[in-house]
């Protein structure tokens, strides 16, 4: 098996184990991965993976401290299209509001601002996971909303 394919399998197994929310130590994760056939896994590798994928220790339903990967804290990978970071696009009479994955709003806002007035964007304000975008003169909020939907290939 190619090393990149083996790495993908390891990541898949690692994420699946953390979704079970029953591992309270890195040693338990190492043991579970070894039982799944990843003989060369060790504690330092698990530690790096926990950091890379943004794992946190939290209490599960049984009130045990366990490692988990909260979906809303998922770290985007280099192969993730930007559209996957956009969760919702809505508007009112004044602005278009875009909800993103945590930490992605400034990146998406910068992209929108780079399109500029010719595309109907006067400007954007971004927090951690929310963007307010206002239309340029000559464009309606609905026009801007529809253009952003097309840009991120969302359903109308």
From Swiss-Prot:
Top-rank taxon, per record:
Bacteria
Keyword Transcription tagged: yes
Q: Where in the cell is it found?
A: Cytoplasm
Pfam families for this protein? Arg_repressor, Arg_repressor_C
**Pathway involvement?**
Amino-acid biosynthesis; L-arginine biosynthesis [regulation]
* Main location (coarse class): cytoplasm
GO terms for biological process, alphabetical? L-arginine biosynthetic process; protein complex oligomerization; regulation of arginine biosynthetic process
Provide the Gene Ontology terms for cellular component: cytoplasm
Q: What Gene3D superfamilies does UniProt report for this protein, alphabetically?
A: 3.30.1360.40, Winged helix-like DNA-binding domain superfamily/Winged helix DNA-binding domain
Question: Matching SUPFAM superfamilies, A to Z?
Answer: C-terminal domain of arginine repressor, Winged helix' DNA-binding domain
Q: Which UniProt keywords apply?
A: Amino-acid biosynthesis, Arginine biosynthesis, Cytoplasm, DNA-binding, Repressor, Transcription, Transcription regulation
Q: Which GO terms describe its molecular function?
A: arginine binding; DNA binding; DNA-binding transcription factor activity
> Which family does the record claim for this protein?
Belongs to the ArgR family.
Functionally, this protein is described as follows:
Regulates arginine biosynthesis genes.
Q: Which HAMAP family match?
A: Arg_repressor
List the protein's name: Arginine repressor
What species was this sequence derived from?
A: Klebsiella pneumoniae subsp. pneumoniae (strain ATCC 700721 / MGH 78578)
The gene behind this protein is argR
